[in-house]
Amino acid sequence: IPFCPSTCLYCSFTSYPIGLWTKKLDDYLAALEKEMMFTSNACEDNNSTTIYIGGGTPTSLDELHLEKLLSMIDRYFDTSSLLEYTIEAGRPDSITYEKLQAMKNHPITRISINPQTMNQKTLDLIGRFHKVEDIHRVYGQARELGFKNINMDLILGLPGETIEDVRHTLTEVEKLSPDNLTVHSLALKHSA
């Protein structure tokens, strides 16, 4: 999903600020549905084992459009034999309880909540418009709703971060006890 609440200063992925595209979301999902229809027909005999919804930030879609996206996937693909069905829930400022509920109503087996760091000064510096407390809130909501496989993404080498900042982040993430932890090193490059 090529939309985000805003563009993080370090990001090299192609994404568009959702606020500029809200009037085009129905058109985007209609085009995506045609692509899903074509792909499901072309791969009819292929027993896929994984679905991965990435971005951008899929949860930058509002609840209605997120539900529509997930329902289209259910309609066009056999999800009964999947080994993994992941959605990048993404940035805590785009995750709501209602969106988590929508995800839970589908056979999603893994979500990724991506704080990148647990240091507020760094979050502010890199253009992430959420608070550390938001990370704890959405993680708790996801557990409350019964998500049993939660990944968290971190980035090492963010501007101004010291070894002590990284230790703090790791200590805070360890307290949450995610099922998976993905650690990236910052790599500044041109948009993909």
Give the positions of each predicted feature.
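Local cysteine-cluster metal-coordination motifs and their immediate loop/turn environment
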Residues: 2-15
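Conserved non-cysteine loop/helix-boundary elements of the Radical SAM core domain that shape
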Residues: 15-42, 46-192
